């Protein structure tokens, strides 16, 4: 049997679907090709004689859609396009694999939940039946939404960037915790949770952050946090020039004699909520309102709007309003800008002991080795492009980082 390298939907059969992608092996693969042909490959499942194709022989077509691509990346196969990223890009959807379980497979998966090699226990025929159901659903979307270069860039950039962060376990107390970034959320803002620990929801006041510390003796947890991030992002896409710090300039222009932190809160409310008459007196916010109106007009006319950098589609927004549509685009703008930024940052860590430890919305957290403290200044320069500036925080643990 020879592997056919042509466009398809690929569903890996893995050793245990309940484990982290870094802890599983690929025991088989199912392919549904665009011409309707199917191919089944068994590597190690006991139900059938192993095929004469090994995992190392698999070289996917560049436009093959791969379900759960993370598992392949951890197994050193980087070809193909992640299915959930693709679905999220075009139809704001993603696949819950449990919803496609055939009846017998669902029963076995629940009964033998704690079995180490669950994938070896469930009959291969049931797993191929499950894979076929997913592939046929994806193929219907695939035929209606041909893959373009923006989609390829989006899917590959997101899977590769978050893999480079996710592969670094985090030291929490005396144990290491795995990360699991999931970016196919409604707004595109990634979550990060695994095995009952939610890094994205860590409270700053309950002490949970105090347990996160450096993996290196005398190492430092260092966070880079953009200053006035959303307002500068909007200024970038609106081609609006501030003469000095945006918050200070807007406050002075509007003659608002209130506490600075209180004013920042008002700015945030006017960006993400309705722009008040007071703020409409400023040319920047009039430009923002014009953009809000333009986005909503496009949504009403075309039934969708597209993200700024990768042109990801947003459609079927529930109870859509001008501000809600704009919020979707704005939050995707934040994430897409940061993914592109991380992509440019990662080469600075090549051959370094220090690691990119975690991404938390518009904050970037690194575990810096004591011999590489000069890396902080290198990273600062890399972050501070596009008129952006960062605040830098450092500490022995994540809960006690202080601005430096």
Language model features: what each stretch is:
Residues 66-69, 224-226, 270, 368:
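Short His-Asn-centered micro-motif
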Residues 18-35, 43-47, 174-258, 311-349, ...:
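Acidic, glycine-rich two-metal-ion catalytic cores of nucleic acid-processing enzymes
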């Amino acid at each position: 049997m020879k592997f056919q390298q042509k466009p398809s939907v690929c569903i890996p059969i893995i050793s245990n679907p309940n484990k982290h992608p870094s802890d599983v092996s690929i025991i088989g693969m199912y392919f549904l090709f665009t011409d309707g042909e199917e191919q089944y490959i068994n590597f190690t499942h006991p139900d059938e004689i192993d095929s004469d194709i090994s995992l190392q022989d698999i070289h996917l077509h560049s436009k093959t859609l791969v379900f759960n691509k993370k598992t392949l990346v951890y197994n050193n196969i980087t070809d193909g396009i992640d299915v959930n990223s693709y679905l999220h890009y075009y139809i704001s959807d993603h696949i819950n694999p449990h919803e496609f379980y055939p009846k017998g497979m669902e029963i076995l998966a629940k009964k033998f939940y704690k079995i180490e090699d669950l994938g070896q226990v469930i009959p291969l025929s049931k797993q191929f039946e499950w894979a076929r159901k997913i592939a046929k659903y994806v193929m219907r979307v695939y035929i209606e939404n041909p893959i373009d270069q923006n989609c390829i860039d989006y899917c590959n950039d997101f899977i590769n960037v978050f893999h480079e962060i996710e592969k670094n376990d985090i030291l929490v107390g005396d144990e290491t915790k795995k990360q699991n970034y999931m970016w196919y959320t409604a707004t595109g803002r990634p979550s990060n949770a695994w095995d009952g620990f939610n890094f994205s929801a860590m409270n700053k006041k309950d002490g949970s952050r105090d347990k996160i510390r450096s993996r290196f003796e005398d190492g430092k947890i260092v966070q880079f946090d953009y200053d006035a991030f959303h307002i500068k992002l909007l200024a970038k896409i609106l081609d609006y020039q501030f003469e000095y710090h945006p918050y200070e300039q807007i406050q002075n222009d509007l003659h608002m004699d209130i506490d600075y932190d209180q004013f920042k809160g008002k700015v945030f409310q006017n960006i993400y909520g309705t722009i008040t008459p007071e703020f409409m007196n400023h040319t920047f916010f009039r430009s923002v309102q014009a953009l809000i109106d333009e986005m909503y007009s496009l949504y009403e006319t075309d039934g969708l709007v597209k993200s700024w950098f990768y042109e990801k589609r947003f459609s079927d927004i529930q109870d859509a309003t001008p501000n809600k549509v704009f919020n979707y685009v704005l939050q995707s703008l934040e994430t897409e800008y940061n993914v592109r930024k991380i992509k440019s940052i990662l080469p600075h860590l090549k051959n370094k002991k220090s690691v990119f430890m975690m991404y938390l919305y518009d904050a970037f957290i690194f575990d810096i080795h004591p011999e590489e403290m000069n890396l902080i200044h290198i990273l600062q320069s890399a972050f501070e492009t596009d008129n952006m500036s960062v605040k830098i925080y450092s500490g022995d643990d994540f809960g006690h980082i202080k601005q430096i």
